[in-house]
Structures are given as C-alpha cells and as structure tokens.
Amino acid sequence: MAEFTNMLMNPWVLHLQKLELELKCPLCLKLLNRPVLLPCDHVFCDSCVHKSSQVESGCPVCKSKHPKKARRDLRFMESVISIYKSLNAAVSVHLPQLQIPNDCNYKNDALNNSNSPKHGESEDSEMTDKDVSKRSGGTDSSSRDGSPLPTSEESDPRPKHQDWTEKQLSDHLLLYEFESEYDAANHTPESYTEQAAKNVRDITASEQPSNAARKRICGDSFIQESSPNPKTQDPTLLRLMESLRSDDPTDYVKAQNHQQLPKSHTEQDSKRKRDITASDAMENHLKVPKRENNLMQKSADIDCNGKCSANSDDQLSEKISKALEQTSSNITICGFCQSARVSEATGEMLHYSRGRPVDGDDIFRSNVIHVHSACIEWAPQVYYEGDTVKNLKAELARGMKIKCTKCSLKGAALGCFVKSCRRSYHVPCAREISRCRWDYEDFLLLCPAHSSVKFPNEKSGHRVSRAEPLPKINPAELCSLEQTPAFTKELVLCGSALSKSDKKLMESLAVRFNATISRYWNPSVTHVIASTDEKGACTRTLKVLMGILNGKWIINAAWMKASLKASQPVDEEPFEIQIDTQGCQDGPKTARLRAETNKPKLFEGLKFYFFGDFYKGYKEDLQNLVKVAGGTILNTEDELGAESSNNVNDQRSSSIVVYNIDPPHGCALGEEVTIIWQRANDAEALASQTGSRLVGHTWVLESIAGYKLHPVIG
C-alpha cells in the first residue's frame, strides 16, 4: 500500500517543484513577495525591483526602460502562492520521504564552505524541512553546528537493503528523465529541474555507473536517514543530488561549469543562464493572465507611486459589465452606411440571411446582414426575385471599397449617374445634400455638380411602367384629360403599406394625371393612400400619422380605381379612412377640418420629456410627431425641473413625462412584466418630483390617431 501511495504521489512532487520554480523571483530566488509586473511582462518582488531601480532604472532581466508609474501590482499572484503553500504542506504530510532536505550529507568543499543557508533558499522550504525532520524522529543529516555527520558504513544505523524504497525512488528519477525527453521532443522551454535531469542523462551515458550505485544515489537523494559510502559513488552525481536538495536547482549546472571552464567563462555563462531561464520562466508564467493584466492596466487608477488604488477592482468590474451590456445590446448596424440610426431618410432596418428576410432572435446570428430599406433599395446591383434578395453580398463587397464623398466612410454603393463622375454617397448622406437630384423610377442619382444633366426618362418623356402596360386611351378620353382642372397636376401621392397591385395602380394613376409619387413622407404630399383590411381599417404607420397631423387626405386604394374609371380625380371624402386597426376613429377627418380653419394644433402648449429606454430611431420618430403636432421637446431632466418650477401656480401642468410601455425584445413573460413595472415606477417618481403628468408612449400615438387628447394621469 505504501509503495502504491508513493507511486501515486511522485507526479505531484515533480509538478510542485516545477510550480515553486515558476513562483520564485528571478532576483532573490525566493517565493514572490508582493509581486510587481513590469511593462516588459517580467515579474519581481516589490522590494527587489525597488532595490534594483536604485542602481539602474529598467528591467533587471531585459534591461528595458520604463517609468515607475508603469509598474502594476499582481494581487492574484499572492493567492496563487498561498495555494501552492497549501498543496506543498498537504503533500508533505502524506509523503514525507519525498521531501528534499535543505542540507546535504556530503557537501563539496568547493561548492559550499559556510554553514549559513544558501542565497536561493526560501523561508517556506526551511519550515517544511524542519517539519519533516521532526516527523522523522528528530535526526538530521548534519549536526547542530553544521559539521557533517560520520559517513562510514559502520556508523550507519539503517539497514543496508531497502529494496522497495530504492525501487520507488529509482522510478522517481526515471520520471524526471521521461519528463525531460518529452519536453525536448515537443520543443518546450525547460525549467531548472528539467535542465538538471537532462544533464544527468549526459553524465550517466558517458560514465555509466552501476545499477547498485544508481539506487544508492536515488535513495540518498530523497531519504534523510540514508548515508551511503562516498567511495562507491561518482562525485559528479553527488553534486547533482546536492543541487536537488537545495532550493536552487542550478547549483549542479554552476558546479559543472566551475569544474570545466575558466573563471571568466564561468561567470559569463552562469549570468547568461540565469537571465535566459528567468525570462523564460516569467514568459511561461504570464501567458494565461496576460489578458487580465491588460484589463487591469486600462481600468485601474494609478497613483503617483505606481500603486493601484483601493477601488480598482470595483472599477474594473463596473467597466467590464458596461462593456458586456453594450456588446449584448440590440443595436444593429447597416452594412452600407455603417450606421445604426433609423430615420425617415434611411427607412427601417432590414435583416437578411442567405437572401431571405429574418426577424426575431434570428437577426442576431452571425450570418445575418443588416441594411436600411433605403440603402438596399438604391443599391445599383441588388435586385429581388420574389421575396429573395439577389447579389446583396457582392454589392456590399463592392461598396466597402468605395468611400462616401460626404462622410469619407466606406460602403458608398450609390454613385452619380454621370459615368465620368467619381462621386459616390451613402443614401442617407445624399439625402442631406439638397442639390442632389433623384430619379425614383430608375433609382438614379445626380450629384450637385451634375444636377443639370437629364435622366433617361426626362430625355424621352415619361417612361411607361415595366410592371404593367398602361391602359389604352381613346381620343375621347384624351380630350377629357386636356380639360382636366389644373390642380390635378399638383397631386403628390404617398403610399402606406400598399400591396404590389396597389403600387402598380398608383403608378398608372400618376402617369395618367401627371401626378408625383413620393416614397417617403414630406410636407408636399397631398394624398396618403393606405391599405385597409376587410373592415376598412388602416395600419397605423408614420406616413398615416404625419398625414393626419398635416391635415392631408388619408384615403384607401378604391379612390385610385374610381379616379381611373372616371378619367379624373374623384371626390376624396367618400374614400376617406374613418378608423385604424387600433380602434381610433375619425382622426383624419377631424385633423383635416381643423387645419382648414387654422385652429391650434393638437399638442399646442404642451412640453414632453421622454424618459427611459426606447429603441434607437423609434424615439426620434415619436419626438418628430410631437413637434409636428405643436408640442415642445425637453431633452434633459434639468429642463423638466426648470419647466415645473415655472408652472408652480398652474393647476394644470404643461409638462408630460413619456415612458416606453413596450416590453424589451426577447424577454420572457415574467421578465416583461417586471421590466415594464420598474419603468412605470421610475417614471412616476420623476413625474411626482417635478410636478409633471405621466403617460405611456402609446398615449401620444392614440391622441394623434384620433386627433384628440386622451385622459392623462396625474
């Protein structure tokens, strides 16, 4: 059982010795005390690097220069050292015979002439050796005054033959040889112990001691009670065993160099070995925590003495959590214009995977392409086959090679129609340039320098729609068209959620009555043509709400059919939409009549503050609606507080706090209720503090859709 335990613990002893070497300071050769990381990635004790900096500034190993403020404390290394001490103590309890004593039975006079501990010994090793000596019965290999004990075979009290112990310790030495051969085969950096084991192989291959002598050497290396006859042992192997007993495994290498080289060569070679081994040990030690060190360098607050402030860990965790929150946010960036902003000029954000539109949680997959509807609509080489987008990836790759003339960012796939012109734009950037000209039929653009150039459809008159041939016009209808009132030429049509057939019908109507089609809302629109369901209700879109606020006609697609049938625009009132899908009634008619009589706007005199989280772009649309309705936007809580202080004597406050009542995307049912409830509580606290009224964002939409103020809380 004891033999099995020893065989099981041998790897632990080997790796603990390796770990101890990695945790030692290259200067004092003791376990790191308050470890400090230099910019060159070398680690030393705080006191050692302080003493070294008084002699020469810079790293003692690589000699690189650095200011004192660039040093970083490695607090986690102290925890690693503490764990190592606990592991070493646990192994010492269960396997005391494998502990390497501090002093050797046979000291070479040329190597050690003093009784004091060596320079590289650590306090932990001394304490461990004392404990082992006590457990071994209080006998030590040397006397109290430091002189060696008698070494003759007659004075050796132990039995001469301990087969199981010698076999076990011989296996332990073979384990050293196996580890060294494995590291050499895989080209890994060798530690101090592995280098010593490698030297053992070279010596034993040349001198070839007997098996009995090898067993005595191994037994004497790890058992304190053993005291073999020095006459039967090779002195070179004895020096190796002495180095293994000490805390500095390079003693054997140094002794061998002293024996073979002159003094000057010995000093240079030992210094080189020390520098190389120390740098390799520090490099291996810092491979894993290098990323953590970089985070600490970026986030921790450094005082004038180069010490980390007490709250650096808290600040680091806060910054990491903020970065994670920002990374996991639901913002998607357009592949063309490199912007996440959603506005009327950009259109909604669309998401495509392999040419097919996706929604929900699928939009955050790695293979999904995000583009604005306007950007993909005006991309020259992108086209549709049904609902599938073709050539999108190739167009994105082409656009990423072209810089925008306005913002100098890549992704400008839309170029000027003039072939010799090298100007290219993002679609949102081009819309901000008033002198750009647009062809909404062929999706062509003219830059300000070539705005006088004619589009193809302007050279040969209005082009017939490719989607559907125009109905034949007989001479009688042609005469009626000539007699059409002049105001029909000023028709500006804007479709809202129309089907493909309704879009073709609107194009035919525009050609027939010389009307203009606007794909986006603008104040010049005269008719908003919206699709309706079987009940005659329309979808509540931004175009419909803007049309209501501006007093425009909000009509259904039947008006276009009736106008084409009558060969002239018919009266719009019978086709005016009365209700939307949310149940709000008579909003378009009420708004239109009030606009005709120049009555105050819907939100005249009201001031709105939008509180909390909103989807990017959606909040801007809400604020634009409020402005068009006559309301005022308060951008900060300070402005809200100042407004409430001005209206202290007013019984009815004019300031309104608006919060988002839509649940976040992708949340479970229980989480949605909790989040919305928390938003309402926070908004209510702000409203009560400033004396404002509190509403959800749907209150704004419903008031506009019905063109009347709904009841307000508070």
Swiss-Prot record:
GO biological process: DNA repair; double-strand break repair via homologous recombination; leaf development; maintenance of root meristem identity; maintenance of shoot apical meristem identity; negative regulation of DNA-templated transcription; positive regulation of transcription by RNA polymerase II; protein-DNA complex assembly
Record-linked SMART domains: BRCT, PHD, RING
Zinc fingers (C2HC pre-PHD-type) by residue: 331-382
PROSITE patterns named in the record: BRCT, EPHD, ZF_RING_1, ZF_RING_2
Intrachain S-S bonds: none
Keywords in alphabetical order: Developmental protein, DNA damage, DNA repair, DNA-binding, Metal-binding, Nucleus, Repeat, Repressor, Transcription, Transcription regulation, Zinc, Zinc-finger
Basic and acidic residues biased stretches: 118-134, 155-165, 264-283
Induction: Up-regulated by the transcription factor ERF114.
GO cellular component: nucleus
Positions of PHD-type zinc fingers: 402-451
Segments forming domain BRCT: 482-577, 598-713
Major place of residence: nucleus
Biased composition annotated in UniProt, kind: Low complexity: 135-147
Cell location: Nucleus
Keyword Repeat attributed: yes
PANTHER family: BRCA1-ASSOCIATED RING DOMAIN PROTEIN 1, BREAST CANCER TYPE 1 SUSCEPTIBILITY PROTEIN BRCA1
Function text: Binds specifically to H3K4me3 regions of target genes (e.g. WUS and WOX5) promoters to repress their transcription via chromatin remodeling. Required for the shoot apical meristem (SAM) organization and maintenance, by confining WUS expression to the organizing center, and for the quiescent center (QC) development in the root apical meristem (RAM), by repressing WOX5 expression in the root proximal meristem. Plays a role in DNA repair and in cell-cycle control.
Protein name: BRCA1-associated RING domain protein 1
Organism: Arabidopsis thaliana (Mouse-ear cress)
Gene (UniProt): BARD1
